[in-house]
Amino acid sequence: MTTRKSVLREVEEFRLAVELVELGARLQVLESEVAISRDRLTRLYKELRGVSPPKGQLPSSPEWFLTWRPNVHASLFLSAYRFLMAQGKQSRIRCIVSAYRLYVEHISLIGEDLTLSFTRAWTMLRFLDSGTLVSSTCKCCGGSFVRHKYDLQTNFVCGLCAPPPRAAKGKKLATSAEPFVVPEDLQQTISIEPAAMNRPKDAPLRRMGSLKP
């Protein structure tokens, strides 16, 4: 029975490793989350990707998550992750995987380019766990956004409600009044009120998909 359990456990570990590689996880992420040797993970990565795992350190700057566009993307992922964790139905790494898939789905729905890689999303959660990054609620839209722990700004307003001037440089705002409707199940995943998600294309949330900083 023990042998059977160990075999099934190994199968689950490899299945998870395959998912992580397909989502773009770096080798360091795989080593942290999967109980498989580095040598076997390297061979698995090469088999799935056709190339050796990239070398070098993981992204290590929390400041990246504070710039305008990355902050919006990171905050969307974080809201999905926290929603799934609150349900208590999946392990932490499974919540990360599911939240990232939801993030990718949502970004593709609004026609925006992916900004947050899986490895950066995973790294951001480590910054949050260590207290280097925190989240605050925007006083305008009620969404939860990533901030630095030493950011002393009060009455916080997010980058969607008050985008920086450079965000619109060289790009004309969309003027169509056609609403972007978010699926109900996805509305439940992000901590922004549903009414705030179904606003005109030229409203702050739609700007995310119509501007290039």
Curated annotation (Swiss-Prot):
Q: What is the organism of origin for this protein?
A: Cupriavidus metallidurans (strain ATCC 43123 / DSM 2839 / NBRC 102507 / CH34)
GO biological process per UniProt = bacterial-type flagellum organization; positive regulation of DNA-templated transcription; regulation of bacterial-type flagellum assembly
Q: Where in the cell is it found?
A: Cytoplasm
Quaternary arrangement and interactors, per the entry?
A: Heterohexamer composed of two FlhC and four FlhD subunits. Each FlhC binds a FlhD dimer, forming a heterotrimer, and a hexamer assembles by dimerization of two heterotrimers.
Broad class of where this protein is predominantly found: cytoplasm
Q: What does this protein do?
A: Functions in complex with FlhD as a master transcriptional regulator that regulates transcription of several flagellar and non-flagellar operons by binding to their promoter region. Activates expression of class 2 flagellar genes, including fliA, which is a flagellum-specific sigma factor that turns on the class 3 genes. Also regulates genes whose products function in a variety of physiological pathways.
One GO CC annotation:
cytoplasm
Any idea what this protein is called? Flagellar transcriptional regulator FlhC
